[in-house]
Amino acid sequence: MKKLMGIALAVAVLAYAINLLFDAGVFYRVQDINLQQCQKIPGISGAEDIAPLKEGGALISSLNRHDNAPGALYYFQQGQAPLRLPGDYPAEFYPHGIDVWQKGTETWVYAVSHGSRGDRIETFRFERAAMRLVYQPELSRSVGKNINDISVIDKSRWLLTRDHAFSGMLGRVEDYLRLPLSLVLLVDDAGEHTLLDGLHFANGIYYNPQRGRLYVAETTNGTVSSWAWRPGEASPVLLGRFTGLHGVDNIMPDGDGLLVAAHPQLLKLAAFQKDAQARSPSLVWQLSLGTQGAVERSQIYYQSHGQALAAISVAAPLGGRILMGSVFDDGLLTCGEQ
């Protein structure tokens, strides 16, 4: 009996390990797709996230994660070099996910920043005519730890992803065991509230206020979940989970659908983080939505072994093309018909 139990346990552990390796993309075959229509844009490091502007151009979160220097926000317009925006940045500014809120002629920029005392949302007003940022301390605030991305509802209400419950070694254990301990937080004038829990490495987030639809990328199980929710409602209603997307990262709207950047081989992403010569593959999905707003279909827009830009973490429509950035690599990639 003990022998049978031991065999059953060994089989269960082996099956779990194989499933874990599958989710990490170890068995995923990378094929180069749509490389010929892409152009590399130098002049920026660690462009983890992109926020397109309604009047054209985009703001970009930039941080060289291979040194300890603070980061910055950049402005980019098709056909021009990335411009580092001057402004009164906080002393500790290490940006990750960003979003913008625009009303009339004014634009506010919200950036997740990882500081020595925890994470903050640092808020700026973007003065387009002067091409500069003005820090808004009254709209900035501490938000705990392990915050990854932000989707802005309005000037003082935001949705945040908390990708891990723990940091350091315990955070790695959380990943290896695929523990569903990740959250989506609603931040408003009353404080921080848990909107969703039980998620696997909640990463990118996008909220469509017109349709009342919320989308969350769960990295370690390669899923984008779709939810119906509007401010004032108690809990989001799950519309569906679309699986098989491999290491999903940031989510961006693209017409009637979504663009989702992904890391198809997560172990290579971890290696690239430590060694810039160990290129990490890149993948961008185009997702189609059904009549209820849930993700229903997917197709690959771009895929590579990381030759031009490794570890692509975001893809956003801009000026009739698709602009891509990477969390760990240098430069941008712009793709599409000229």
Per-region residue spans from a language model:
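Blade/loop signatures of beta-propeller domains
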Residues: 12-36, 71-76, 177-182, 283-294
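Beta-propeller domains
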Residues: 26-30, 55-87
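Beta-rich, blade/repeat-based domains predominating
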Residues: 44-54, 88-104, 141-158, 164-166, ...
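Short, conserved, GDST-rich strand-edge loop motifs in beta-rich repeat architectures
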Residues: 60-70, 112, 160-179, 260-281
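Blade-loop segments of beta-propeller domains
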Residues: 71-114, 250
